[in-house]
């Protein structure tokens, strides 16, 4: 019992669980993105490795691990090797303070559903995520390649420029909530969707939310802000000279940053793990209904499938989904499983937006990219913060 109650043991267990789930999520985010873009372009996407391509991430990992790890002779080797490590470390470190749910009680153990609960969690994420640009800048410089250098410089300028409107967009809901703790920030949005920072307060933060999402796309170097990796201009940008797992580290860092900014948007504006309406009106039944319907649909397609493999895989996944629907009805797990569902659903919706935008929009020119933030986004973010601050001060006198 003393071991279970020990802070070190609980922290190690949480770290192992979060790391394992995160690595699996990073691997499958690429599969989901390829599927989403494929369906946008009316093609099947990954389909051969495993049922419906579900084992494609495993095949990609094996391929990257077994590929030859080339180090060009003309690079600055210490900085060249440090760059991908720095990028992925900063990306993973920022996730360590994100709360996935409320404080939970498991037997004698009481713990928060996050790696560590900092009272300055928002500030920590801003500081750590900003350091990720050093990894990209070092990669561009150490590669001793003109395309890599231009990509690194573009990324540095872009991330620094869009950090300002993002910080101003974050400051507005913080003024309303009056806290830098991510857990407390979510707890102050409890009740219903009308209490979320997006819609509540003296000045609903719709503008802040839009600015934050736009800046998040730029911060993560995603379309339409992927100028540092513009293939038609820079070959592959800052990671042109990288191969094997060092190459994969930059992609893992990109997807980890996507998860971080999506989770931040959920926590700051969308009520975190809070349901959109109270449990008395049936919010606790939503996961069971969704998984139950999905399971029945999969069973139906399995019965009517043409291919032999589909006759096995569809019913198997249908039974799994029906089992998950039943688990959500168990009172003993609802206290932590329902909040986790709502948090993942909101974060997943924003991640889907990242993929949707990639499949539909072209990239900006570099002058348009920089002009947009300094001439439009930054002034609007500043004006929004001033109006929010004035109204908060006026209503709390």
From Swiss-Prot:
Ranges that cross the membrane: 7-27, 84-104, 120-140, 156-176, 198-218, 258-278, 279-299, 313-333, 337-357, 376-396
UniProt topology in membrane: Multi-pass membrane protein
Record-listed E.C. numbers: 7.1.1.-
One GO CC annotation: plasma membrane
Classification via PANTHER family: NADH DEHYDROGENASE SUBUNIT 1, NADH-UBIQUINONE OXIDOREDUCTASE CHAIN 1
Function: NDH-1 shuttles electrons from NADH, via FMN and iron-sulfur (Fe-S) centers, to quinones in the respiratory chain. The immediate electron acceptor for the enzyme in this species is believed to be ubiquinone. Couples the redox reaction to proton translocation (for every two electrons transferred, four hydrogen ions are translocated across the cytoplasmic membrane), and thus conserves the redox energy in a proton gradient. This subunit may bind ubiquinone.
Protein known as: NADH-quinone oxidoreductase subunit H 1
Source species of the chain: Solibacter usitatus (strain Ellin6076)
């Amino acid at each position: 019992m003393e071991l279970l109650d020990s802070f070190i043991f609980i922290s190690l267990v949480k770290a192992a669980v979060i790391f394992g789930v995160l690595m699996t999520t990073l691997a499958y985010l690429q599969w989901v993105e390829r599927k989403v873009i494929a369906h946008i372009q009316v093609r099947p996407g990954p389909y051969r490795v495993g049922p419906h391509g579900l084992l494609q991430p495993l095949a990609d990992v094996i391929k990257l691990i077994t590929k030859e790890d080339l180090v060009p002779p003309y690079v600055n080797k210490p900085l060249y090797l440090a760059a991908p490590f720095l990028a992925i470390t900063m990306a993973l470190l920022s996730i360590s303070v994100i709360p996935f749910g409320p404080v939970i009680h498991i037997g004698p153990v009481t713990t928060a559903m996050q790696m560590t609960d900092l009272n300055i969690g928002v500030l920590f994420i801003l500081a750590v995520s900003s350091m990720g640009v050093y990894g990209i800048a070092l990669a561009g410089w150490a590669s001793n390649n003109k395309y890599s250098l231009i990509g690194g410089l573009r990324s540095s300028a872009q991330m620094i420029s869009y950090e300002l409107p993002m910080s101003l967009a974050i400051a507005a809901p913080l003024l309303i909530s009056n806290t830098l703790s991510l857990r407390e920030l979510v707890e102050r949005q409890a009740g219903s969707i009308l209490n979320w920072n997006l819609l509540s307060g003296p000045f609903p933060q719709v503008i802040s939310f839009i600015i934050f999402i736009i800046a998040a796309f730029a911060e993560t170097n995603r379309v339409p802000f992927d100028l540092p990796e513009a293939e038609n201009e820079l070959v592959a940008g800052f990671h042109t000279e990288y191969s094997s797992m060092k190459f994969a580290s930059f992609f893992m860092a990109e997807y980890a940053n996507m998860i971080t900014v999506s989770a931040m948007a959920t926590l700051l504006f969308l009520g975190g793990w809070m349901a959109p309406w109270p449990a008395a009106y049936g919010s606790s039944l939503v996961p069971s209904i969704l998984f139950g319907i999905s399971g029945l649909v999969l069973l139906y397609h399995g019965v009517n499938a043409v291919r032999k493999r589909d006759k096995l895989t569809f019913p198997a996944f249908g039974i799994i989904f029906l089992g998950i629907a039943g688990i959500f009805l168990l009172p003993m797990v609802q206290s932590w499983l329902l909040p986790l569902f709502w948090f993942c659903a909101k974060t997943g919706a924003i991640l889907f937006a990242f993929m949707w935008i990639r499949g539909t929009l072209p990239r900006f020119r570099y002058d348009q990219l920089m002009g947009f933030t300094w001439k439009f986004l930054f002034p609007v973010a500043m004006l929004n913060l001033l109006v929010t601050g004035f109204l908060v001060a006026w209503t709390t006198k």
